[in-house]
Amino acid sequence: MQLFRIFLLTNLLNLSLCGNETFQPYKTVGDVPRDAVELWRGYDARAEPLDVRIIKQWSEDGIVTRYVTFRVGTFKGAESRIAAYYSYPDNGAKNAGFVWSHGGGQRAERNRGRYFATQGYATVDINWLGRPMESDIEINTDWGKVDPTQGPRFYSKALRSGWKRNLQPDEFSIDPVASPRNANWFLLAVAARRAITFLEQQPEVNASQLGFSGFSMGGMITALTATDERLKAVAPFVGGTGFKHLNFPGDVRGSGSGAHFKDTDLYSKTIDASAYWPFVKCPVMFISSSNDFHSAFDRIYQSMALLKHPNWRVSTNMHQNHGPGPEQWVLLNQWFDQYLRGLNPSIPPTPPSTFSVSDGLATFTVTPKNQDRLLDTEVYFSYDPNSRTRFWNHASSQKTGDTWSVQIPVHENLPLYVFSLCRYRLNQPVQLQREQTATFALNSLEHALIPEIVDRKQLSQLPKTRDVFEDFQFGTRDWSSRDQRSIKTYKFQTPDLDRSDSNQLLIRLNPRGKRLALRLNAGSKFLSQENNLGDFSYVKNLLSNEPQEILVNRHDFKSTEGKTLEWSKVATFEVTLVDRDTNEKVMLTSKAGQGFIESIKLKKIDNQ
């Protein structure tokens, strides 16, 4: 009898817990939704109480910031709560607001919310990864018996050793069968929708003026949340593209994540961002980098092509991976000013462009709008199907009236990608969180000609017409920089460069009386798997402060793995000069800094 009572109480408890679950578990494979619309059907992000708890509040300079936690839901009988910063301008008004979602390895930031409050926005910055936010506050995100985080390195209560990307069940998943609800992205999208609910319930927020933005993983969360009809605009950063399970044309090994999923069909129709963009009704500003590993360039346009409305823009920082510049960051302010606050920053439309092919030549034209504010129009092209490591060649364009045009040769069994970046003047400089800018950049449509058969080996057969690797005649147009000092390029991946391993780097330097050190870094990351040799470095203290030439053999580069560098397998090449007297890096993005390096060549050196 006693055993019966225990059994009965246990079952009643399980029934009670099951009844309070945010999602009833799917019992069979047949119960599992097969598309994104069905997956979210019936879920109401407002249904459950948020149970908001204010942990701490700061009030300073007309800005209020609160450290809060609120309930995401109940999963496997345990409550999941997320911590966040809620910031708003203390102006007595109902402000436009948006949710910010940080990227992988990152955390919510109090100063980010403070900055956007100075711009007139209320924000909730969700700390989905669970990293510490304040040194004196232990209360934080607690996912309970589920875990969509990145393992114990970041989240002290992690239930798994690392990142769960597949849809298969385990002891910490919602469903006991393969299901999209077992993917970490699903739980993060639930938390994102709950954050929208939190924001719309705040008395300082105008619930009809809500947006969503996020960086990297936060960009993917943005994409999976953008179908929420409460949102009036979204702006994903370096994340949020679809088709992540597919390899690039030419079957670039490792470029797709399909190997992680046992059921790629279920993934592609329920969790991949391509399953969501067709149902996004609000305006989209996609902000990224030309060589981004996470939001691959071509996939951005493939994703935007799924939208059923034309109200979208793309802006990418050139020759950069995972690093938007000030000309991109400012567009978050401009986009939300226009679509959330009802201001009119007059963001031009996507620059109209055309593309045609005839007699072995492709013709590309672009006719940007708002040319009274237009400062520059740059056209870029590439034959490389690997958008993570391709070098975007700057094309010499002809201007006729209001239109720029270029002609580019087409090669058999090689794709061709071409687009334009248009730089505009802002009405006045805008102070960003960390920098200031007086300009912004918008991309045209990317036009792609992809043959039925893509043979990447044909890239090495193209004519070798590039004699000078760099002479800075056009400044750092072909380079990028994170710190405005070291400069990095993908130029080793341009097919017009002779990358024979018998060649050497010839670097002409003019220290102009300074005691300098030269540092070179080369990396193969994000090339196809078979070509990824790892990272290499070279360091040399210049023995003279007079003009000189330095020869660098590929064997001179050091590898922590003991490998030998191959010129054709250099994806990124970084140059740094250090003033040995001050131990400070020379600012190579400046004209003065570039004057120290007269030229860089990759060529065969006789008598060596």
Predicted regions and their residues:
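Short beta-strand/loop motif that positions the catalytic acidic residue
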Residues: 280, 286-288
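Primarily recognizes the serine-hydrolase "nucleophile elbow" in alpha/beta-hydrolase
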Residues: 194-257
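Cap/lid segment of the alpha/beta-hydrolase catalytic domain
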Residues: 114-189, 241-253
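Extracellular ligand-binding interfaces
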Residues: 465-470, 479-563, 569, 576-607
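N-terminal cap/lid segment of alpha/beta-hydrolase-fold proteins
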Residues: 42-92
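Catalytic histidine neighborhood in serine/cysteine hydrolases
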Residues: 307-323
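Surface beta-strand/loop "capping" patches
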Residues: 338-381, 393-407, 458-464, 501
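Short beta-strand element of the alpha/beta-hydrolase
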Residues: 83-86, 94-103, 123
